[in-house]
Curated annotation (Swiss-Prot):
This is O-acetyltransferase pboB. Gene3D superfamilies: Chloramphenicol acetyltransferase-like domain. GO terms for molecular function: acyltransferase activity. The lineage of its organism: Eukaryota, Fungi, Dikarya, Ascomycota, Pezizomycotina. Belongs to the fumigaclavine B O-acetyltransferase family. InterPro entries: CAT-like_dom_sf, Sec_Metabolite_Acyltrans.
């Protein structure tokens, strides 16, 4: 890792897949007494910078004379802490202030976020991590933004937990911090030099050719600008007992469903799906049926029937954390980008008919089968392809019809800031860039049967149609905390 001013930064193969945007998260703490929170967070951030120098850097993209790009990095000095931590005091209670700003995304950004998701001048230095502590009379809204060029959502969750531990140390608690600097160096070394050695003659349709970071960032900014007026982020919950019941029923049905089509399974290779697979299948099925309402009706006009029978394929894109899937594995506290995108295709006709349980079985198994195929060899092949493709490739929203990001195992709710602030009670990603973007939010450890939390980005019309879907209405409930 670069440790001196204005040094070149060599992106890892996975870094190259992401544009110059920010992963942004809001953590809400409802508190009786907010005095001293700003001081605690400032001291915690100062300690975090000493512990994890990687987080206290800025990145700058340069366009060279030969039209190639280069990236440089330099540290933010302790005297410039305000570039990493912004403190803003608000007169109104937390939820009231959010509700009043919720109809204007630019206003929400200006008041509550440390940096914009998309309004970035990529030629200017941009911090790896920047935090804004919004101090309200009844709590703190901690807004965290991390630069996706070098850091993914899992890395952000690790950084938030490290910040929380640093705040606890400032309060005298005994906390063991990970060896963050060594882990960042080791993770980059693996991704740059040790892992990209698997050579296969194939392309990866999950990504698109990309001219440069400038054009890529401009395209993303255009999408985000359009979404600000057309896409709404809605929040939902699914009771844990509903998820368990659906998973149990699916696993009971799977062999029967596939044996009816001539598949025979032995005792050791019987198909199975996880709770997350079931939730993804339920989401995919319900949004698809809202988008193509004719799928579940028996009386269909000819053009709708033709569409259903045409063999059209729909895709869901699922980011997959590869830290533990590669060999050798990446360090557990590696904060850099460690996620790749996989596509799960399904014929549109899979979602037709009224036997929705069989649909969830089939779709859930398709998700499980694709995720199980993400081996170390496939990941290494992708890394090699990124480094040797004739043109740069990058993530693009046009590769799938829907995207489901599973944050279930990210430890945001376990970030304990100590006796002064405790753990966050609510978490959200405030950005819905395109319609059909879904987040399965982090799991709560308490209570044990806490509901699953979902965040869905759709147009108002699609949300209305989704609400009319009988299966969705049976299992999913609105979460009204976030406006």
């Amino acid at each position: 890792m670069v440790r001196t001013d204005d040094q070149p930064y060599v992106p890892t193969p996975i870094d190259r897949l992401f544009s110059h945007s920010y992963v942004r998260t809001q953590l809400a703490f409802q508190l009786d007494d907010v005095s001293g929170c700003a001081t605690l967070l400032r001291r915690g951030m100062e300690r975090l910078i000493r512990t994890s120098p990687f987080l206290s850097r800025e990145l700058t993209i340069h366009m060279n004379d030969d039209q190639t790009e280069s990236i440089t990095t330099k540290p933010i000095s302790p005297q410039e802490l305000d570039r990493m931590l912004k403190i803003k005091h608000h007169e109104k209670p937390l939820r009231q202030a959010l509700i009043e700003a919720s109809n204007d995304r630019d206003c929400l950004d200006d008041k509550f976020m440390p940096t914009s998701f998309h309004r970035l001048d990529v030629s200017q230095p941009c911090p790896v991590m920047v935090v804004q502590a919004n101090i309200h009379p009844d709590g703190v809204l901690l807004a965290v933004a991390t630069n996706h060029m070098v850091m993914d959502a899992t890395g952000q969750g690790i950084a938030v937990q490290c910040l929380a531990d640093c705040c606890r140390l400032e309060q005298g608690d005994v906390v063991s911090l990970p060896t963050c600097s060594a882990d960042q160096d080791r993770g980059r070394e693996l991704l740059l030099h040790e892992l990209p050695a698997r050579i296969v003659n194939r392309e990866f349709s999950e990504y698109r050719p990309c001219r440069d970071l400038y054009s890529q960032s401009a395209a993303l900014a255009d999408l985000a600008h359009k979404a600000a007026t057309t896409i709404r982020v809605a929040h939902f919950t699914i009771a844990a007992e509903h998820v368990h019941a659906l998973k149990t029923r699916c696993n009971e049905m799977l062999s029967q469903v596939f044996e009816s089509n001539g598949h025979v399974f032995g005792a050791d290779d019987a198909p199975w799906i996880s709770s997350s697979d079931v939730v993804i299948a339920l989401i995919w099925r319900s949004i698809n049926c809202a988008r193509y309402q004719a799928l579940t009706t028996t009386q269909q006009p000819p053009e709708k029937q033709a569409k259903k029978d045409s063999g059209e394929v729909v895709h869901v894109g699922i980011p997959v954390n590869v830290r533990s899937r590669v060999s050798p594995v990446l360090p557990g506290s590696y904060m850099g980008n460690g996620a790749i995108l996989v596509l799960v295709p399904q014929p549109l006709r899979t979602f037709s008919g009224t036997d929705w349980m069989s649909t969830i079985c089939r779709v859930g198994l398709a998700v499980r089968t694709r995720l199980a195929a993400i081996t170390s060899d496939e990941i290494r092949s992708l890394l090699h392809y990124i480094l040797n493709a004739p043109d740069p490739i990058a993530f693009s929203f046009d590769v799938a019809d829907y995207f489901v990001s599973n944050w279930r195992q990210m430890g945001f709710y376990e970030a304990d800031f100590g006796s002064k602030m405790g753990k966050p009670q609510r978490i959200r990603n405030p950005d819905g860039v395109v319609g059909g973007t879904v987040f399965i939010m982090p799991k709560r450890s308490q209570p044990e049967n806490a509901p699953w939390e979902l965040q869905v980005s759709l147009t108002d019309e699609m949300l209305r149609l989704l609400d009319q879907d009988d299966v969705w209405a049976t299992y999913v409930r609105p979460d009204t905390y976030w406006p």
